[in-house]
Amino acid sequence: MSYTDNPPQTKRALSLDDLVNHDENEKVKLQKLSEAANGSRPFAENLESDINQTETGQAAPIDNYKESTGHGSHSQKPKSRKSSNDDEETDTDDEMGASGEINFDSEMDFDYDKQHRNLLSNGSPPMNDGSDANAKLEKPSDDSIHQNSKSDEEQRIPKQGNEGNIASNYITQVPLQKQKQTEKKIAGNAVGSVVKKEEEANAAVDNIFEEKATLQSKKNNIKRDLEVLNEISASSKPSKYRNVPIWAQKWKPTIKALQSINVKDLKIDPSFLNIIPDDDLTKSVQDWVYATIYSIAPELRSFIELEMKFGVIIDAKGPDRVNPPVSSQCVFTELDAHLTPNIDASLFKELSKYIRGISEVTENTGKFSIIESQTRDSVYRVGLSTQRPRFLRMSTDIKTGRVGQFIEKRHVAQLLLYSPKDSYDVKISLNLELPVPDNDPPEKYKSQSPISERTKDRVSYIHNDSCTRIDITKVENHNQNSKSRQSETTHEVELEINTPALLNAFDNITNDSKEYASLIRTFLNNGTIIRRKLSSLSYEIFEGSKKVM
């Protein structure tokens, strides 16, 4: 059997140094193995110094450890020997004392060359030692292990042309190649770690410079913004100094009132709704008239007479005019008060001239109808004592003697309007003038004596556009019951509304209430004109500015 076919197998025992320093760093172990392989102390010292400079927190150097333990520069490995029964023993067995303790003072030298010579003399190649050393050297990195395994395989594969020299070449070349590879790997790892540390240091420096540049740029931006703000604050004033606050500004209307109106052709609407709202007094009269008409039976409404008379409201307690604490026209509601229709004779005369002059004005031509009449009204009281008395009025024309009207007059309601600023007050009364039946002719009462007689000299001005008739009447009252046959003369001014127009507006109030309201308003407006004219005429007469003939 040749040497290459069956090389002898040997087992390497652990040295004392391996047992003590089995937990040291892998790089330190590699250093020891490299020192044992080539026996070069300077290379180990240089490698140790490089490792200490590149790696922090490393274990203590090997030399220090050896000096502390008292051993030489070379690690001692035990010599292997074989017993008769092929059992493996270590050199430590020989160095044990009698008591069984290990003697650490004995010198141990481990020489790879001597071991190889012994192996060569025995005829066995150092395959296991090389594999063990290679395994220890290849522990630091996986990449180096992979590369070294490839190189080992390439070196172990012999060429076919040199089969005869395999044993000799393998024995002489393997230790030298392993030594060179170990040196290259240790140096490469040391250089790689140094380069890596330098790259990390350079990267850290670059990061520091980048951070410094970023901070500097931020500071520059802030500084530039502050400079801009300082320039703005130095060159311009706050807005409160340039613009006056709204609360301190003078008020300027956005729309100039009445400046765009053509004053030469001024047309004003009655209101913004283009209507004239009724005042409270007018509204009160409208409601009162409506309620009074509504209380009358429908078959009797056609005989309604709504009239307005002027006089002075007198309290029942005395002959003087009432004086309530009011300053404008109002409704006087005291039941005991009454109004006797009568005005001063001089005012009556001036008012007659005033109204006639209005009717004769050119623009009013055809608007007024004037009727003059002289009649005598005789009032009869008829009825049984157990019945409500009836008052019949017979109107006879004085010139012809004919009976012009024979009616029964019933008083329904009245409304007193007090006018403190005027000379006269107003009474609005609503009466019924019912015709006497044919079976009760006027001739029947000619033989009877009337309770009162009144002679009327009347001028009537009918204004159809306002549905109003103005009666200016001079009345002579003949009291038949009094002992003295003296007559009493009164001057009456009376306004009467058109009854058919009033009833038509009343019936149509649900469809068009404006017609009814307008009719009553016009009636009151005509009364206001007469009332104010009487006040102005009385002031002129009694102050002496106007002489009455």
Swiss-Prot record:
One short Pfam family name for this protein?
A: mRNA_triPase
Q: Which cofactor does it need?
A: Mg(2+)
Q: Could you name the Gene Ontology cellular component terms for this entry?
A: mRNA capping enzyme complex
Q: Which UniProt keywords apply?
A: Acetylation, Hydrolase, mRNA capping, mRNA processing, Nucleus, Phosphoprotein
Q: Phosphoserine modification sites?
A: S15, S124
Which residues are annotated as site, described as Essential for dimer formation? D280
Cite the GO molecular-function annotations of the record.
mRNA 5'-triphosphate monophosphatase activity; polynucleotide 5'-phosphatase activity
Check the record and name the InterPro entries matching this protein: Cet1/Ctl1 (IPR040343), CYTH-like_dom_sf (IPR033469), mRNA_triPase_Cet1 (IPR004206), mRNA_triPase_Cet1_sf (IPR037009)
Q: What class of enzyme is it?
A: hydrolase
EC number(s): the record gives: 3.6.1.74
Q: Where is the composition biased (Acidic residues)?
A: 86-96
As stated in the Swiss-Prot or TrEMBL entry, residues carrying the post-translational modification N-acetylserine are: S2
The record's active-site residues are K223
Kindly list the places in or outside the cell where this protein is found, as annotated in its UniProt entry: Nucleus
Q: Which reaction does it catalyse?
A: a 5'-end triphospho-ribonucleoside in mRNA + H2O = a 5'-end diphospho-ribonucleoside in mRNA + phosphate + H(+)
Q: How does activity depend on pH?
A: Optimum pH is 6.5-8.5.
Primary localization = nucleus
Annotated region (Disordered) at 30-169
> What residue spans carry the Basic and acidic residues bias annotation?
135-157
Quaternary state and partners of this protein?
Heterodimer. The mRNA-capping enzyme is composed of two separate chains alpha and beta, respectively a mRNA guanylyltransferase and an mRNA 5'-triphosphate monophosphatase.
Instruction: Give the UniProt family note.
Output: Belongs to the fungal TPase family.
* Other facts: Present with 3900 molecules/cell in log phase SD medium.
Q: What does this protein do?
A: First step of mRNA capping. Converts the 5'-triphosphate end of a nascent mRNA chain into a diphosphate end.
The protein's name in its UniProt record:
mRNA-capping enzyme subunit beta
Q: What is the scientific name of the source organism?
A: Saccharomyces cerevisiae (strain ATCC 204508 / S288c) (Baker's yeast)
